[in-house]
């Protein structure tokens, strides 16, 4: 059984394992560089470690593959009978990360 971990990043918790691809909130790291996630909540595999709140000494290392923007979300607001309307779009930036190792 391969090692996996649950990490906290960008206000979310994600289950990751070696070789998995995750999309996280935009990180200030250039594409091609490595990023280390220190906020590890849980490590599983042959033995499990549960953090209270974090697992001591556990890290997850990944490589930034690219940065991008998600599909556009369009919001439309209007007030009936008042000839008032507003249309607004938003594209959330993200970072694509490939997990290289889970270190417990």
Swiss-Prot record:
Keywords from the named record: Ribonucleoprotein, Ribosomal protein, RNA-binding, rRNA-binding
Xref: Pfam families: Ribosomal_L21p (PF00829)
UniProt keyword rRNA-binding, yes or no: yes
Entry similarity comment: Belongs to the bacterial ribosomal protein bL21 family.
GO CC annotation: cytoplasm; ribonucleoprotein complex; ribosome
Protein name: Large ribosomal subunit protein bL21
Encoding gene, per UniProt annotation: rplU
Assembly behavior: Part of the 50S ribosomal subunit. Contacts protein L20.
Biological processes, Gene Ontology terms: translation
Function statement: This protein binds to 23S rRNA in the presence of protein L20.
Upper taxonomic lineage: Bacteria, Bacillati, Bacillota, Bacilli, Lactobacillales
Organism: Lactococcus lactis subsp. lactis (strain IL1403)
GO MF, any single term: structural constituent of ribosome
Signal peptide: none
Keyword rRNA-binding in record: yes
């Amino acid at each position: 059984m391969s090692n996996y971990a649950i990490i906290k990043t960008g206000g979310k918790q994600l289950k990751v394992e070696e070789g998995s691809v995750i999309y996280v909130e935009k990180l200030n790291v250039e594409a091609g560089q490595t990023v280390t996630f220190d906020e590890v909540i849980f490590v599983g595999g042959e033995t499990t470690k549960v953090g209270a709140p974090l697992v001591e000494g556990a890290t997850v290392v990944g490589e930034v593959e690219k940065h991008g923007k998600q599909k556009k979300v369009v919001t439309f607001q209007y007030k009936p009978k008042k000839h008032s309307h507003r249309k607004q779009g938003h594209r959330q930036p993200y970072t694509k990360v490939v997990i290289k190792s889970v270190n417990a």
